[in-house]
Each structure stands twice: as C-alpha cells, then as structure tokens.
Amino acid sequence: MKRVNYLLCISLILFVVSCAENKEKISVVKDNNLEMQMIEAYREGIDEFNKGDIFFAAKKFNEVELLYPQSIWAPRSNLMAAYAYYSQLYFNDAIYELERFLNKYNNHPDTDYAYYLLAICHYNQIQNEKKDLGEIIKAREYLTKLVEEYPDTEFAEDAKYKLELIHEILASKELYLANYYLDREKWIPAINRYKKIVNEYDTTIFIEEALYRLVELNYKLGLEQEAKKYSVLLGYNYQSSEWYELSYNILNKKNQNT
C-alpha cells in the first residue's frame, strides 16, 4: 500500500537523521537511556517486519508506544503494528491495533488510512454472506465513513468501488432468503424479501429476477393488478430480459387458454 511504503520510508529517514545529525545530538541520545530503548525498539521492529517476523515486529512497535507514548513515534508505531498483522492476514489482531489507534490518536493525519485499513480487514473476512453479515456491515460502516468524511483522499475512490460490491452482496443475500421462502411456499415472507430488493437494491443485477418473482407470486395469490404493476416496471426497464418474457407469459396465460 502506498501510504505504508511512505510511512516506512519516512520512518527510516527520520531514524537515520535522529541518530546521525551531529555528534552533540548523539551524545544527548546516549545519555537518555529511555530514548535509546525507543529508537532501538523501532529499528528492530522495522528489521523484523522486513524479515517477515510480524509478531516480533508488532511487539517492538508496541514497545515504542510504551516507552514514548507522547512522542510522534507512538502513533506511527501503532499503525506499523497494525500493518504488520494485516500484511500476514492476521486481521483480528490488525483490527485491535487500528481500533486502539482511532481511540487514542483520532486527530492524527493518518486517521483516514487507519479507517481504510480497518475497512479492508473486515472486507477481506467476508466469506459467506448467507450466514454472517457481521463483517459486511462493519466494512460498509468504515467505507461509508471514508467516502463521507474523507472524500478527497486516495482511499475514497476504492471505498466507493467496494461499497458497490457490498451492495451487490447484500442484495444477493436478500434474493437467497426470498428464494428460500419461495421453495417452501411461504409466499408472504418471499414477497417481502423481493420487495426489499426492488426498494433498496434496484441498481443491482438481482432486480430483474425480484420483479419477475413479484409478478409470479402476486398472480398466484390472485392479485393480478399487483402482478401487472411489477410486470410493467420490468418491461419498461428490462424489455429484452428473459425475466420480462417469463412475466409476460404468466399474465397472458389466461388469454392463451381461452
């Protein structure tokens, strides 16, 4: 990620400058054992991160925070610990560090990055949306926050794209549940789920089937005017769709039989 590469570069530059600016400064640092421990811990964290030992790296970054909690190194170290975990897919550990960062350093310039990485950690754990919505909802929450509160950042555009994908995922869950009720002949719960797709997810790829099912079920229940309403909507927007052809056949079945 661009921001993390930037943080790594800046951290290394600042580390070198702080240690080699001049002899007088080096002697001051040597006299301050706590600061030396902090610098050494950060250096070890960077080294271990580059070697791939992310657990030891994160431990060292956490040490920096403990040694110098009020320094500029503390929030950077917190973010580096989070990224270390994220880089090896330890999402829950990364989430813990990021939530801690946002609680302690909510006015930091890299807050937008923390929200983005937090959203990605939840997003990457979306596995079976039919069973668990927890990660989807969390990802949507943080991505929405990015788009609304940090619209001009480098992360906002990707956040918009991922929000569109989440919208599709949520619509697919509604369709799954609607079809579940349909297969079990639970008409009213099925209708309610299909209506939710029409009302809340009308820009997704699932809208055509939802409209057709509303034609089918309303016709089955003898609600022909309702069936016609959804058929007109389907025909107006998706006239070339196979779902419209099926709905047309349902409504003209009576005429074909006479």
Language-model-detected regions and their locations in the chain:
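Acidic, polar-rich low-complexity tracts and alpha-helical solenoid repeat scaffolds
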Residues: 18-258
